[in-house]
Amino acid sequence: MYSLARPLLFSLDAERAHALALRSIDTAYRTGTTSLLSTRPVPLPTPAFGLMFPNPVGLGAGLDKNGEHIDALLALGFGFVEIGTVTPRAQDGNPKPRMFRLPEYQAVINRMGFNNLGVDALVANVQRARRRGGLLGINIGKNKDTPNEEATSDYRYCMERVYPLADYITVNISSPNTAGLRELQEEQSLRRLISDLRETQEALGAQHGKRVPMLVKVAPDLNDRDIDAAARVLADLAVDGVIATNTTVTRPLIANHPLAAEAGGLSGAPLLGQSTLVLRRLRARLPESIPLIGVGGINSGADAVAKMAAGASLVQCYSGLVYRGPQLVGECVNAIRRRREAPSGGAVAPL
């Protein structure tokens, strides 16, 4: 079905196509025809962060920023869906155009800039969702006009609002599209922010009588020293998990493309090697008690297996769906299933 719809979607501006695709998925869900888009995979229960995921393949943050399509997306067969990034207050994001397809590379460049309706709107949407068939992650960020010195208050506010509703919460400090945000990954800034949020997490756990895991999403543009520092902080503060990685600001594999000079984060196939390398290095530096989600460049079941081989417990897709459609979900689940059933038992590949 997606192969028939793709030419129409690709004839539209990327952001308009994004909106149309979501409306189509919603329509299929409401009319009971989701099976025409995607066959729900046989369950492959996977433990991580003290949770049991129906399968290890999730949707990365950014597709459903406001939590308006949760049930329709879960119906495609994802084991979990991550919504957001959401900020305390609504914001428009960056000026359009701000999303670009690079079909020759199966890639996307975006500079959306955390456009969202604000955390209160997201909370209302989540409360209306039925949430059958998978788990829900909520990705939180800061408003663009909040200085980094005050960022903790934005993250704390979002965490307090979504905590009762989320299965896990992701702290996004790695988007390249909010000025200065990635500075929060620097060791001292990271330690201050995550320490404060860990205290908030523990207080909220006591208040609500449940512990919601807190994950941190990192950039792919980290050198070895950056990775060492981040791993040291995240291990010291005992975060529940790490998502590796966000989009990249580098362009070595698409340097000759006319859109290479566009500002924003590059995702899709060209990100696979770089993001998987960061994933593997983090796995080597973090204790096994901190599971990793591998995301970046997954366009096939083999790509998902590469993430698992590098040390991921779970994976997420996003840009790959633009080029492959919802069938990518089941393909990834089945590829991971075959790997898990292989005689090697899914060992982590060495550095």
From Swiss-Prot:
Q: Which cofactor does it need?
A: FMN
Task: Provide the catalytic activity annotation.
Answer: (S)-dihydroorotate + a quinone = orotate + a quinol
From the UniProt record, give the pathway where this protein acts.
Answer: Pyrimidine metabolism; UMP biosynthesis via de novo pathway; orotate from (S)-dihydroorotate (quinone route): step 1/1
InterPro entries linked to this entry: Aldolase_TIM, DHO_dehydrogenase, Dihydroorotate_DH_1_2, Dihydroorotate_DH_2, Dihydroorotate_DH_cat, Dihydroorotate_DH_CS
The subcellular localization recorded is: Cell membrane
Matching entries from SUPFAM superfamilies are given as:
FMN-linked oxidoreductases
Q: Which residues bind FMN?
A: A61, G62, L63, D64, K65, T85, N139, N172, K217, T245, G268, G297, Y318, S319
Keywords attached to this Swiss-Prot or TrEMBL record, sorted alphabetically, are:
Cell membrane, Flavoprotein, FMN, Membrane, Oxidoreductase, Pyrimidine biosynthesis
**Which residues participate in substrate binding?**
K65, N110, R111, M112, G113, F114, N172, N177, N246, T247
Write down the top EC class of this protein: oxidoreductase
How does the protein's chain sit in the membrane according to the entry? Peripheral membrane protein
Enzyme Commission code? 1.3.5.2
Molecular-function GO terms, alphabetical? dihydroorotate dehydrogenase (quinone) activity
| Pfam families, sorted | DHO_dh (PF01180)
Assembly description:
Monomer.
Q: What does this protein do?
A: Catalyzes the conversion of dihydroorotate to orotate with quinone as electron acceptor.
Protein name, per record: Dihydroorotate dehydrogenase (quinone)
Organism in which the protein naturally occurs:
Xanthomonas oryzae pv. oryzae (strain KACC10331 / KXO85)
